[in-house]
Amino acid sequence: MTATITNLPSLYDPFTTEAKWQKFWEENQIYKADPNKGGEPYCVVIPPPNVTGSLHMGHAFESALIDTLVRYHRMQGRNTLWLPGTDHASIAVHTILEKQLKAEGKTRQELGREKFLERSWQWKAESGGTIVNQLRRLGVSVDWSRERFTLDEGLSKAVAEAFVSLYDEGLIYRGEYLVNWCPATQSAVSDVEVESKEVEGNLWHFRYPLTDGSGYVEVATTRPETMLGDTAVAVNPNDDRYKHLIGKTLTLPITQQEIPIISDELVDPAFGTGCVKVTPAHDLNDFEMGKRHNLPFINILNKDGTLNANGGEFAGQDRFVARKNVVSRLETDGFLVKIEDYKHTVPYSDRGKVPVEPLLSTQWFVKIRPLADKSLAFLDEKNSPEFVPQRWTKVYRDWLVNLRDWCISRQLWWGHQIPAWYAVSETNGQITDNTPFVVAKSTNEAWEKAKSQFGENVQLEQDPDVLDTWFSSGLWPFSTLGWPEQTPDLAKYYPTTTLVTGFDIIFFWVARMTMMAGHFTGQMPFQTVYIHGLVRDENNKKMSKSANNGIDPLLLIDKYGTDALRYTLVREVAGAGQDIRLEYDRKKDESPSVEASRNFANKLWNAARFVMMNLDGLSTGDLGLGTGNSQSLELSDGVPPSLADRWIISRYHQVIKQTTHYIDNYGLGEAAKGIYEFIWGDFCDWYIELVKSRLQKDADPLSRKAAQQTLAYVLEGILKLLHPFMPHITEEIWQTLTQQPEDSPQTLALQAYPQADVNLINPALETQFDLLIGTIRTIRNLRAEAEVKPGAKIIANLQTDSESERQILMAGQSYIKDLAKVETLTIAAGQQPSTVTKKKPQKGLKTIGLVIAGLVFLRVALAVADTVDNVPFLGTFFEIVGLGYSAWFVTRNLLSTPARKRFLAKFFAPPTEKNLSGTVQQAPEAAEKSIAGVVGTVQVVIPLAGVVDIETLRAKLERSISKAETEAQSLKGRLSNPKFVDKAPADVVQAARDALAEAEKQVEILRLRLQTLV
């Protein structure tokens, strides 16, 4: 390719650009995976968002992280597949549709199952694509040709296969068990769908009278209404207080049922009174106790949370209404002893947002222990999967150890209907707990099995319940690749490489996937689990619907562009697994952090425009652009690289090395920050500025060409480095830089990621260049502090005893003069500055000098007079020597202006500046009316006479010192107040401390400046 390079538009338009390239990538199937191609596979399956959902900031954060990894590995040459899809979300869909039906005055039961499912599919078709289209706006590099849905035909086949297989192996069973029941959704929920909340409640104490009239026992409970289902009272067999009561009976208040007093080791003698009411149908511990002691199981609740006929006079009342009425009745009858305030934990339904009830119910269960043990074996023997950060391994392991059997049936209609068919002809056309059934992969298979067992006239009815959504989600990593069929996708891309997900679904999803995969495929479903943190709001609070503090990512995309949001979310990650804080002004609908990323995009755009504007006369072929072979820079014959060229190339390869290391180890935030600092700082602020003079038309042709080639080489490398983080703007610039034809299918997304050439990394050169940059920056700062006009040329004197540093300064003197606007630059040997102790500068230095001179002269005269009286001839000698020495001392050290300044500096040492390494050092010896600073061991002095108005500058410095001292004193006062330090938020106190340190530093610097103006 030898096209002449044209330029970019003057302004970057993210909205047009992003839409253009998203369309291009999808239409050209850039991200379509091919299992028949070579290359090490890199596969990620998307954590499927609910089909009901819309994009929230958590989705955007997770998608940005995944896409960064996927794009990086694709550019590394791996055979990459990111597989998209959505989850059918049974409970969420039911919640939405049943609200709609309620508004119409209907229920789903009135509508009927068939009509309800028709409405569900219709709703999915109309609204289900919302989140998919929103994901497209994020520019995610997924293979849309492989998009899956957990209710599609292939996944339904996988679900049936898994269910039947587990049932045949005895790992799925139907049984009566105590389940978590959500009255709001009227469905069982699994343990991991239950959220425990600490609440302020009550502990009620009641008397239960002994049937023989000899007394009573006292029990305590947080759920008084459940006493209507009590079938015993239990005590610990070792509790001497109650041993004599074991075997006796009690008469239950209200119901008048006679119940036994039993002994059980489970009872804690220290809890309450040591007597525990036993309600086997409504408490898990009581359920186990009831089975051990063969107690009756009395269910008092309907599925909607009201009391059933076993509630007697309270039947039909809501559980919480019944609670109040039961307490009132017991108080009236004299059985209420006391009510205590009691803080305790209450289980809530994650979906229904109401307290769940332990309810005795016939459900389908997975026998979880054999599956969990396989996952534990992989973890303990092979550290598979590997968790990043590693601390989540223990959380995952503890969960696997403590699992109990998984209730997988849900009393819903939208979802995978349980593949079990009841022979209702055997139980008078009704499904009962005793109705025989067959389990099959299809209706036809069910009929064949049923006919062989029950005869040709058998009548079948499929189980009305559906499977827990997490059952199908647990199969996601391999069912989406074609399992149970042995497909090319499954062979190439399974097990998948990385799972990126939040810590909050390790229990819901990650453990389920590893158990299912371990059982059905004999492998863990992914090599690495990268656990990310939460996106927190501007006040560092977790974003949630209930807190109403979420930030719509689409709003930020519409305001700043997709790349700006993506880059912000990734850059803010301080370390793997850490939460991020997103700055946001809700009144203005503005995000300073995303705005900063947009500014970064604009900075890159303007830098690219500058580079292209200065590549005239050269073609893409001359520059080696777009060839895919830009790992090393080959300058034209006879073109010598300058010091700046060699420095930027070294820095570029150092950044490649660092970026690759960070991404390979999931340090995405560190990688993003490193690229940012290189582009904004090294490339834009320094290298481009350093080469501007070499790009002039009248510059040396060879030097100009070297600058052009280096600029083009580094710019293309920058675009590749940054592409995984900001894909749209980098694609747009790269297409223009490499002059791709409009109909070309070439894309930056498929270019090779830069590889570091360690031979081009020169740490010594980078250190040397740091000295030049530090010197330029110091001169610029001194100019600004002295208010030297921007266009004014100045004199700068540099002194250092280091021969090597003088050589560096001399080699880079043209850079110093150009960038610091120095007309005359001297570089000379000089003493290295020494560390000093700061003392307060004094005023009236001339007066003080004269007074000291007079005192010294007088003291010497008196000493000589005393000596004359005591030692012959000695007085004359000392009179001559003493008076002569005194005259020399006063003249040399107090009256001569330059010497006076040196003398006073020893007593009234000026405040000092920090050098590059942070050591506080004395300012260099400066000429009168000059300003000075230090960088490393180099002393920088800028004479100001004739450049600025010294008196005006001195007055301004004195005012600034006074203001800074006042601020520092105010902050000291606040920080010395115990009420402020102890009661103010920690971040506010720290901010005050930081402000004080900054104010004191400012005072120190300003005093130094004032001293050099004396």
UniProtKB/Swiss-Prot annotation:
**Substrates-to-products reaction catalysed:** tRNA(Val) + L-valine + ATP = L-valyl-tRNA(Val) + AMP + diphosphate
Broad class of where this protein is predominantly found: cytoplasm
Q: What class of enzyme is it?
A: ligase
Q: Which domain of life is it from?
A: Bacteria
Compartments where located: Cytoplasm
Q: Which GO terms describe its cellular component?
A: cytosol
**EC number(s) on record?**
6.1.1.9
Please give the InterPro entries that the UniProt record associates with this protein.
aa-tRNA-synth_I_CS, aa-tRNA-synth_Ia, Anticodon_Ia_Val, CAAD_dom, M/V/L/I-tRNA-synth_anticd-bd, Rossmann-like_a/b/a_fold, tRNA-bd_arm, tRNAsynth_Ia_anticodon-bd
Any one GO MF term held by the record is: aminoacyl-tRNA deacylase activity
Motif 'HIGH' region residues? 49-59
Q: Where does ATP bind?
A: K545
> What is this protein's function per UniProt?
Catalyzes the attachment of valine to tRNA(Val). As ValRS can inadvertently accommodate and process structurally similar amino acids such as threonine, to avoid such errors, it has a 'posttransfer' editing activity that hydrolyzes mischarged Thr-tRNA(Val) in a tRNA-dependent manner.
NCBIfam families on file: PRK05729.1, valS
Similarity-based family: Belongs to the class-I aminoacyl-tRNA synthetase family. ValS type 1 subfamily.
HAMAP family linked to this entry: Val_tRNA_synth_type1
Write out the domain note.
ValRS has two distinct active sites: one for aminoacylation and one for editing. The misactivated threonine is translocated from the active site to the editing site. The C-terminal coiled-coil domain is crucial for aminoacylation activity.
Query: Subunit structure, per the record?
Result: Monomer.
What is this protein identified as? Valine--tRNA ligase
The uppermost taxa in this organism's lineage are: Bacteria, Bacillati, Cyanobacteriota, Cyanophyceae, Nostocales
